[in-house]
């Protein structure tokens, strides 16, 4: 591994020129976090246009699961491009789509047959799940969670509640969506303790929501991330998801799991819900499914997938090249990368927790597998989020050649490609340590 190697001031002259061109022609809606202008990437390394090499611990927001340009994924893409690039799976048939659907139906937890609808992204998978849940149940209402991120298309945005700015001036959003607190023990909204709270964040649904706002017989689905992603890499208490599943089954409500960021080996299991033995009615997937090719999927129990032909569609969803990439990706995941995520993720979490003992500003280190968050908080005992400190440390890490991304109010996420090894972990933690120390001294 050559990275990191920083040869120029960041951004370098070539990067500055491209950034200036970008400002003139691209929409300002893009929320770029630091001035990285990529030339090429391989494995764990990203090279910018000025020849600087970075160690990648963000994987394009947990997308490059097999590393950048894995040769087996590239070969699968090349072989499919020689056959055909596009036909439209909504109107015709091709084997890569069928083979991938068969594989996804096998991988998603739960007994019985499943049906797959292919999309281009996570947000589209959520949109499809909203429609299917309402169609199947003939109910309108949906429950989602504070801190949730399900996408920014209008339907998905109605479920998203990780940042008010995401929703500002886009109303009215779709009606009959109710948000309740997520199971976030570190900053419990009820100021309770996990060992004595009775999991109030689930019980409140029946105690309050079903009593004052909506009857359970009107609720189509509960949409929940097994681990909140953009909300701050929040792992709920162990009783949380099983209690939600029990509540759904009690009232005939569909349990829809958003595994867009947590799925495909990221947490050391193929799907994060496996850590708690959950069997969802619908799973929304994307990101790590195809190593960077644009692909998403909604996988539902077959008895739920009752909508008729043309009830939903997608011109590009399930593109054959993307399906070929996904098949190669899943093969690599099953041949050791899921286990590697569990093994190396444990090392990474241990090393980051060691930093927590040295820096009081690190309030919490949490996560499963290679989905780990480091939360910066005030040191006065109130655990107030330290967003500014988090952002400064992220930028300092970038300047040292370590690529990280923020999430939540004050968290930095560590979500490297699943090919990461112990040596890359040691390098990343060393650079992160230096970034924290220098930032705190400034």
Where do the model's predicted regions map?
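Conserved N-terminal phosphate-binding loop of PLP-dependent enzymes in the Aspartate aminotransferase
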Residues: 1-442
């Amino acid at each position: 591994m050559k990275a990191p190697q920083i040869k120029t001031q960041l951004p370098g002259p070539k990067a500055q020129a491209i950034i200036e061109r970008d400002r003139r022609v691209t929409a300002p809606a893009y929320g770029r976090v630091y001035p990285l202008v990529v030339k090429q990437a391989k494995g764990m390394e990203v090279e910018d246009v000025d020849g600087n090499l970075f160690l990648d611990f963000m994987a394009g927001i947990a997308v490059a699961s097999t590393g950048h340009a894995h040769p087996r994924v590239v070969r699968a893409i090349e072989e499919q491009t020689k056959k055909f690039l596009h036909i439209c799976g909504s109107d015709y048939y091709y084997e890569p789509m069928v083979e991938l659907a068969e594989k996804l139906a096998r991988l998603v937890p739960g007994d019985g047959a499943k049906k797959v609808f292919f999309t281009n992204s996570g947000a589209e998978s959520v949109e499809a799940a909203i429609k299917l849940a309402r169609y199947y149940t003939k109910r309108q209402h949906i429950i989602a969670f504070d801190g949730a991120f399900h996408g920014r298309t209008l339907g998905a945005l109605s479920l998203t509640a990780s940042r008010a700015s995401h929703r500002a001036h886009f109303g009215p959003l779709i009606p009959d969506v109710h948000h309740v607190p997520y199971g976030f023990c570190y900053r419990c909204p009820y100021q309770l303790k996990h060992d004595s709270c009775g999991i109030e964040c689930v019980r409140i649904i029946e105690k309050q929501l079903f009593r004052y706002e909506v009857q359970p017989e009107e609720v189509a689905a509960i949409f929940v991330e097994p681990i909140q992603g953009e909300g701050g890499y929040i792992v709920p208490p162990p009783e949380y998801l099983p209690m939600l599943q029990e509540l759904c089954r009690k009232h005939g409500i569909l349990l829809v799991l958003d595994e867009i960021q947590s799925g495909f080996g990221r947490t050391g299991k193929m799907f994060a819900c496996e850590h708690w033995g959950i069997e969802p009615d619908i799973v929304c997937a994307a990101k790590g499914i195809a190593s960077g090719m644009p692909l998403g999927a909604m996988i539902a129990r077959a008895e739920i997938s009752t909508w008729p032909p043309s009830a939903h569609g997608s011109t590009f969803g399930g593109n054959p090249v993307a399906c070929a990439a996904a098949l190669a990706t899943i093969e690599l995941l099953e041949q050791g990368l899921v286990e590697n995520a569990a093994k190396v993720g444990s090392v990474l979490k241990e090393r980051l927790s060691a930093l927590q003992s040295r820096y009081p500003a690190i309030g919490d280190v949490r996560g499963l597998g290679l989905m780990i968050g480091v939360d910066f908080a005030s040191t006065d005992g109130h655990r107030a989020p330290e967003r500014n400190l988090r952002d400064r440390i992220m930028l300092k890490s970038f300047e040292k050649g370590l690529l990280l991304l923020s999430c939540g109010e004050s968290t930095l996420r560590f979500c490297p490609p699943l090919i990461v090894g112990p040596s890359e972990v040691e390098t990343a933690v060393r650079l992160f340590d230096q970034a924290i120390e220098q930032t705190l001294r400034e």
